[in-house]
């Protein structure tokens, strides 16, 4: 049975988020993690020679990344997961700086994209 080390998983996620202040950084970090896991980068405008049992990834404009693995044996189905790096997020408003009683500065933000806020 597959088990997850929650503490390690959480620490890895927090490190990834800290290293990814923008969508571009997130794509860079994802490519780094994929490379460390043995995935090979592909160029989208070149012919691909894909080998069963290998993983690959493609980036575009340093702002999007797609990763996939070719199974060693033909699979009866396809497993797919997707996400994006640009939304939801908080964006700074125009004239974002707000002085708070001379004690500290706050930044006015707005939600960009659909987000669940509890």
Where are the model-predicted features located?
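N-terminal hydrophobic/helix-forming segments and targeting peptides
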Residues: 1-118
């Amino acid at each position: 049975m597959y088990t997850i080390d929650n503490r390690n998983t959480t620490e890895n996620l927090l490190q990834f988020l800290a290293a990814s202040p923008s969508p571009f950084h997130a794509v860079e970090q994802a490519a780094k993690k994929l490379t460390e896991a043995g995935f090979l980068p592909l160029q989208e405008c070149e012919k691909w020679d894909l080998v069963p049992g290998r993983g690959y990834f493609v980036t575009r404009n340093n702002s999007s990344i797609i990763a996939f693995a070719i199974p060693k044996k033909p699979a009866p189905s396809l497993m797919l997961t997707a996400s994006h790096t640009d939304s939801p997020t908080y964006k700074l408003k125009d004239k974002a700086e707000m002085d708070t009683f001379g004690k500290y500065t706050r930044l006015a933000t707005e939600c960009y994209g659909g987000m669940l806020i509890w």
